[in-house]
Amino acid sequence: MDRLPLELPSSLRQEFKSPFGPVYTDVTQFLTDAGRPIIAVGDIVTYHLQTVDYTPAVAVIDGQTKRESVDETVKAALSKHNKRIDVENQPGTISIALLEALQTAVETPESVMIVVDGEEDLATLPAVLVARPGGTVVYGQPDQGMVRIAVTPETKITMSRLLKRMDGDAAAAFDRLGVDRSGDKK
């Protein structure tokens, strides 16, 4: 039986403190450098992309930034996606629902907003695993900017290794995402 959700053990928390890629404060420069499609994780990152009229292929939001509710301007801007998937995902975990929503979203031709009841902070990890090589996953680094992760075999391996170290059934998570243990599509 699956032991999901996966939980982030305290021994692994430090590895998520440093950015997994270059940090940007200029959205236009980020878009110049980013491969497509783009998966955005975080309300403020998604909002900043939309302020320059760019809608990411997939956005994962939870209505919060730095553990506080986002303001009404951000909420209003984030309501403009073609399709919405609502999921539950508790803080410090990666739920079955989040994994399945990411898998569905990357296969959907129109933009998809995954709205998380709980916390989306760890969604970056499975987002890289399901993303198309050459694409980009972007997430917010508090008080620094937006972090660009180029989706490459190397970044998939990095995220795969982190996922394997989480508490729970990592093999079941890989299966739900439709990827093998190295992060490659099955």
Swiss-Prot record:
One of its GO terms (biological process) is coenzyme A biosynthetic process. Pathway: Cofactor biosynthesis; coenzyme A biosynthesis. Its EC number is 2.7.1.237. It holds the Pfam family DUF359. One of its GO terms (molecular function) is GTP binding. It is an enzyme of class 2 (transferase). InterPro entries: GTP-dep_dephospho-CoA_kin. It catalyses: 3'-dephospho-CoA + GTP = GDP + CoA + H(+). Transmembrane segments: none annotated. Keywords: Coenzyme A biosynthesis, GTP-binding, Kinase, Nucleotide-binding, Transferase. GTP binds at D43, I44, V45, D62, E120, D143. Belongs to the GTP-dependent DPCK family. Catalyzes the GTP-dependent phosphorylation of the 3'-hydroxyl group of dephosphocoenzyme A to form coenzyme A (CoA). HAMAP family: Dephospho_CoA_kinase_GTP_dep (MF_00590). This is GTP-dependent dephospho-CoA kinase. It comes from Haloquadratum walsbyi (strain DSM 16790 / HBSQ001).
